[in-house]
């Protein structure tokens, strides 16, 4: 078809990155609900058979996999010029090394959260809870990466009202607002992290 161009590897990588941001946002929001003991059977929508803990865990695994695929796709691009080392340690990547490094740091932080959560019984509840706060750092760094990085890898300055950037900004604001609500709720009820967690909760 005339005028139709297939998306490039760079285009696909950008979309996958946005999907990862959405998954991590949903995962953190769900985690905040679980931390206050939310149960869809006892509370709205009062639906049985919904296992939020399992869903929370799988969101983390899927999000981590999506975040891995996001830069890995660039290895197939004939124009991006990325190699495996540029993905793993992007401080020397061919374009926008600082935003890319932030993205890599966010990925490693998420991986740390997922792995330590899977083996949380080995750490003990109190120590694991402290380690789990790394998720907030991961979210912050990931959002900064998403807002700062040029999705076309052309080192353009960020356009904060661009649709993609606005999407990341909204996700960041949702996380901030939900976190403020969570700690405000905790102060009112003296309930910090007492929600029931699954054996391998993430």
Indicate residue ranges for each PLM-predicted region:
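Membrane-embedded alpha-helical bundles that constitute the cytochrome b-like, heme-associated redox core
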Residues: 1-202
């Amino acid at each position: 078809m005339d005028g139709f161009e297939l998306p490039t590897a760079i285009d696909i990588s950008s979309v996958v990155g946005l999907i990862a941001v959405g998954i991590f946002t949903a995962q953190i929001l769900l985690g905040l609900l679980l931390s206050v003991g939310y149960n869809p059977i006892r509370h709205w929508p009062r639906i049985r058979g919904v296992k939020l803990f399992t869903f929370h865990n799988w969101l983390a695994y899927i999000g981590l996999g999506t975040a891995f695929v996001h830069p890995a796709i660039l290895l197939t691009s004939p124009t991006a010029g990325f190699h495996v080392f540029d993905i793993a340690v992007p401080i020397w990547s061919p374009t926008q090394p600082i935003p890319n490094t932030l993205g890599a740091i966010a990925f490693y932080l998420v991986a740390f959260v997922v792995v330590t959560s899977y083996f949380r019984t080995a750490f003990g509840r109190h120590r694991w809870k402290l380690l789990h706060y790394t998720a907030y750092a991961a979210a912050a760094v990931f959002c900064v990466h998403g807002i700062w990085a040029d999705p076309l890898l052309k080192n353009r300055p960020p356009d904060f009202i661009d649709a993609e950037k606005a999407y990341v900004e909204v996700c960041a604001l949702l996380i901030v607002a939900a976190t403020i609500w969570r700690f405000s709720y905790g102060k009112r009820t003296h309930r910090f992290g007492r929600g029931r967690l699954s054996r391998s909760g993430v």
